[in-house]
Structure formats: structure tokens, C-alpha cells
């Protein structure tokens, strides 16, 4: 049986502190577990850094990057995350969104066809 491919999950954030924990938990609790989580913050001013720092020692979190200055450009954040990604697949998971816990379990096999 083939090993499950690694999925790199990039979470770009700017001032979404109120959603961050739920978003990150909706990723970490996926039924598909071969993931790396890349957390990015674009110089938030709402305390998002505190939430992200709670995950710094989590085994699934490969990177937490905190910008000192806001880029004003989400595409720069996406690109930064893609450069860090080691997975076969990359999922840009916006910070103010949620997903079903079976999302990756359903999507990865379709991409593998």
C-alpha cells in the first residue's frame, strides 16, 4: 500500500484572532493526519501572535512566521507559505474559515487519481 502523501496546510492571517483557534483546530483534527501546518501572520495588531504562539511546539506545525511589517498583500503570504511547503499538495486555508473534519480525507484520494 502506498504511503499517504503529505499535505502542506498554509494558514495566512491578518487580524483574525477571533477565528484562529477554531480554524487551526479544524485542521489539526482532520481525519487525514499526514499534514504539516504553516502558520503565517502579516503583522496583525489584534493579538493574533499570542494565539499562534500557543502552537509553536505542536508536532504538526512546521513553521510559524510573524511579519514585522504588514505587506498588504495576501498573495505574498501565500507565496511565502508555498516556498516553505514540503508536501505533495498545498492547501491555502484562510484564517477566517472552517472545514469539515473529513475534508482532506475526501479530497486527497480524488487528487491522487
Q: Can you say where each PLM-predicted feature lies in the sequence?
A:
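Nucleotide-sugar donor-binding/catalytic module of glycosyltransferases
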Residues: 1-113
